């Protein structure tokens, strides 16, 4: 809103677009019981330090969220998300930070309806974030080009080539002069 002339379009990958009725409930629940939701407890309670990158990889490999992520992409994530310490490796961002992000879900609906630039959204067909109700609502907004991939919320790691192709195609819809 501060400098709309700097934005020619938006490309969003499985964005957190929560159904408004659930959004109101979740915001209230996070205020009343900030430590109770499973998502919060999981973020705070999971290990954040490992003896090495291999141990971190093995931990994530056993998690449902990473089931459809190839070994290569999972190791890329591990290497990017962890920093070496004198005791091994640790996540670059703490569980407390992750919990804070979960406690403050965005309400993008008004912005999506009033934006003046093209919005390209790629959602995962098996995503827990873009539910069928949310997908239908995204499809109903005229300036949104909504597409899906057979993937979950981690679609850039599950389908990296297809995701990159979507982004490149979206960027290619604007001339070089528009993007500079």
Spans of model-derived segments:
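Catalytic histidine-centered segment of alpha/beta-hydrolase-like enzymes
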Residues: 151-164
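Conserved hydrolase catalytic core segment
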Residues: 1-25
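Alpha/beta-hydrolase
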Residues: 43, 47-120
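C-terminal alpha-helix
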Residues: 166-174
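Active-site loop signature of alpha/beta-hydrolase-fold enzymes
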Residues: 18, 129, 154
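Conserved loop-alpha-helix segment in the C-terminal half of the alpha/beta-hydrolase fold
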Residues: 109-151
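Alpha-helical membrane-targeting segments
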Residues: 17-37, 41-42
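Short aromatic-enriched loop/helix-cap "lid" or pocket-rim segments at secondary-structure transitions
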Residues: 21-26, 133-135, 160
């Amino acid at each position: 809103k501060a400098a709309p002339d700097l934005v020619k379009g938006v490309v969003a990958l499985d964005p957190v677009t929560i159904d408004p009725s659930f959004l109101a409930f979740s915001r209230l629940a996070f205020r009343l019981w900030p430590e109770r939701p499973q998502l919060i407890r999981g973020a705070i309670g999971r290990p954040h330090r490992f003896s090495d990158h291999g141990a971190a990889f093995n931990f994530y490999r056993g998690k449902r969220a990473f089931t459809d992520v190839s070994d290569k992409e999972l190791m890329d994530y591990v290497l990017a998300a962890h920093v070496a310490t004198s005791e091994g490796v640790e996540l670059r961002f703490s569980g407390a930070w992750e919990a804070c992000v979960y406690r403050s879900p965005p309400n993008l609906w008004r912005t999506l309806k009033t934006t003046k630039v093209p919005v390209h959204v790629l959602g995962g067909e098996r995503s827990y974030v873009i539910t069928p109700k949310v997908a239908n609502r995204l499809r109903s907004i005229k300036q949104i080009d909504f597409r899906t991939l057979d993937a979950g919320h981690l679609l850039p790691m599950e389908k990296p080539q297809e995701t990159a192709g979507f982004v490149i195609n979206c960027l290619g819809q604007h001339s070089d002069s528009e993007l500079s």
